[in-house]
Amino acid sequence: MKLTRQQFLKAFPASALLLAGCAARQTAPANTEALVFDHAYPLDYAQQFTADCYEGGSTLLTLTGSGEQFLVLPEDAAEVDGLPAGVTVLRQPVQDIYLVSTSVMDLFLHLDALDCITLSGTQAAGWHLDEARAAMEAGRIAYAGKYSAPDYEQILASNCGLAIENTMILHTPEVKEQLERFGIPVVVERSSYESSPLARMEWIKFWGILLGRETLAEQVFQKQVERIQPLLEQAPTGKTCAFFSITANNLANVRKGGDYVAQMIGMAGADYVFSDLTDSGNNLSTMNLPLEDFYAGAKDADVLIYNSTIEGMVATTDELVAKCALLADFRAVQSGNVWCTTQSFFQQSMELADFVIDLHRVLTEDAPDGLHFLTPVT
C-alpha cells in the first residue's frame, strides 16, 4: 500500500522503532518482539503530545515540544530490545507515582487513579481538591518535597515508578537529571502549553493511555465536550469581560489574548478586553500591566472576574477597592457585576466546562446562583 506523505510522517516513529527492533533481532533473546505499527491514536484538540499504537497493546507517547518519548508496555508484554536512544519504557501498571504537577491530580481523580499516587510535591494544605487533601491527611499520599527540592531518600524508599513534573522543572534541570540517574522515569507534562481549554482537558487521554484506562479517559473527555458544545452554537452576548488580580506591588495581572482562560471567556459568549495582548515569546500565559493601562482597558468591561489563585479571594467591593482604588470607577463595580474565582479553579483542570457555563450564566442571567467556580463580590 502506498503511503501519503502525511501517513508516512505519522508512521515514522513506528518505523524507526520497528527497524531498531529488526536490527537487534538477530542477537536478541527469545522474548524480544518487534513493534508493528497499528494506528495513530486520534486526538481532536491537544497539540502537545501524540500517541502511536502498536500491535499487542503498546503505545508510544511523544511530547511534541521536547521530543521526549515514552513507550508504554502492557504488563505481560515481552521486552523490546534495540529501542532508539531516548525512548523511556514504562511498563504497566505504573504505580507509586511522585506527582508534582498539580493540574494533573484532577485528571487522575476522574480516572479513579488516586491510588496510583504515593508521593506529592504539594503539601496537604496546598490542595484545593478534597480527595487529594484527604489522602494526604490520612497518610495514603506523603509529601516528598517540591519540584526544586525533592526528598530523594523518601522517593527511593517508596519505590517510585514515575515522577510527573510540569515545566517548572526546566528551571532546575539538575533535579530531573538526578531522578533519572536514580532510575526514576520523569514525564514533564506540557498541558499548560495548550492554548485551548479542550486541548488541556484532552490530556486525560495521555494519562489514560499510561494507566491503561483509555476507555474511561475518552468517556470523561467526551462528556466535557458535550457540556460545552451547546454554548458554542449560541450567538455572542455582546458583553465584555476582564479576568485579573492585583499584585502586591500594585500591578494588574491579566491573561494574554491567546491564553485558554481568554478562550473560555469567548466560549461563554463574551469578548475578552485584553484580547490584543499577545505572547511576547516568554511562553507565559499572563502579564503584569501598570494600573493606568489596566484602567484604560477594563474600566468599561461589563463583567470583572477576580483571580483568587495568587493573591487570595475577595468577598466584598470594599476589599476589592482596598487593593486598587481605581476599581471604584469601573462599570462592573458600580453595577455589581464583579465575581471571584474559587481557589480550586486552576487545580480542577478537568472541570473547565463548569467555568464556561458559570460565565455564560453571569452574562445572561440577572442573579445566577449555585455557580461552581464563581462567587459574587458584594
Positions of predicted regions on the chain:
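N-terminal export signals
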Residues: 7-25
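Bacterial Sec-exported substrate-binding components of ABC uptake systems
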Residues: 22-105, 216-243, 367-378
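A short, structured surface patch at a secondary-structure boundary
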Residues: 59-156, 162-168
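Extracytoplasmic ligand-binding site segments that recognize negatively charged/polar headgroups
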Residues: 95, 103-105, 109, 120-131, ...
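Soluble non-cytosolic domains of exported or imported proteins
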Residues: 146-150, 166-173, 194-201, 215-218, ...
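Proline-aspartate-enriched helix->loop->beta-strand connector
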Residues: 152-168, 184, 294, 298-304
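Structured C-terminal subdomain patch of bacterial secreted/periplasmic proteins
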Residues: 194-219, 303-378
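Flexible, glycine-rich surface segments
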Residues: 237-314
